[in-house]
């Protein structure tokens, strides 16, 4: 590098004013918040789990039945990557009919916290998605009543709107399933 290319060039009045104006503008304090979700399909329905609440997504595993537990939503317990998780039928908890298709695309979405994990089988997980909070809409009243309490809003996706899962409400319902 030559000495001439290292010396700063003098700024003309117009460039100086443009840079001064750019630095004088206040920094945007409230940027558009992106909501990151894990998109999943159960039957023909698309659902979105808040990515921050998803511990992991793995290939589907066969759970081990829990003796003396008869609630149809409790599928059993499974060892998922070295951690025991209660496997719960998402559709049964939410009040709609669905049977896992299985196959190569089937996945387990694991929610909760370490030591208190809950796994849900889904037909597929195409990936994660970042959505502007402004693009999310409230769940319409037409969302069927049995599982309306588990949907906190709708997330626009290329597959159509996906129901954003209220993880706290879902896990509270799952705890009730285990107790019965």
Q: Model segments located where?
A:
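An acidic, low-aromatic, low-complexity terminal/linker signal
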Residues: 1-180
């Amino acid at each position: 590098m030559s000495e001439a290319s290292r010396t700063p060039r003098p700024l003309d009045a117009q460039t100086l004013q443009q840079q001064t104006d750019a630095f004088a503008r206040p920094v945007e304090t409230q940027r558009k918040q992106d909501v990151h979700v894990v998109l999943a399909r159960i039957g023909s329905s698309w659902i979105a789990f808040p990515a921050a609440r998803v511990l992991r997504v793995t290939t589907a595993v066969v759970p081990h039945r829990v003796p003396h537990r008869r609630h149809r939503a409790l599928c059993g317990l499974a060892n998922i990557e070295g951690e025991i998780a209660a496997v719960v039928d998402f559709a049964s908890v939410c009040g709609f009919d669905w049977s896992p298709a299985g196959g190569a695309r089937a996945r387990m979405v694991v929610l909760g916290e370490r030591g208190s994990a809950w796994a849900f089988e889904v037909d597929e997980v195409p990936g994660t998605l970042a959505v502007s909070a402004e693009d999310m809409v409230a769940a319409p009243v037409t969302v069927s009543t049995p599982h309306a309490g588990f949907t906190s809003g709708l997330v626009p996706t290329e597959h159509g709107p996906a129901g954003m899962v209220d993880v706290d409400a879902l896990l509270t319902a799952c705890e009730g399933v285990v107790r019965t």
